């Protein structure tokens, strides 16, 4: 078995047109009980005045070793950031931000949960999805008035008595499904971790 020392990871951050490997500190948060995953990127003073990004510009955080980096977060800038201010960080949220900002008002007839969710995701511009294949009894009428997509999915779960979790992973939206784990890391105390 091959062993690598994994003491000090390399960091690469891309936000809008910027790519940074130094002068940044990264905090990434993911929790199955939270709809959003988020990342905070903090800058040293030398970068604070020179960086300017708009709301919803894409951002990526990558970590790794020996110039082999894995993407640990992909998302969008939550608010504009302009150099010269007192802020020293940019907050990114995952694609759930698109669902939060997309408002749905529609009446659905003879519909299943998957059909409503597919419609809502299309309205938000989300194309890659994995929805539960479980068969649910269609409802004759479901009316949605001025709700964001997150609230619509919560309402769907209530109407049908479903407890399906929903989230993004690797840019794909999951509802009642789970992504397959591609890599398994083996950490050994004193060998590759302290």
Label the model's feature ranges.
Residues 101-105, 185-188:
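Short, charged, solvent-exposed linker or helix-capping segments at domain edges/interfaces
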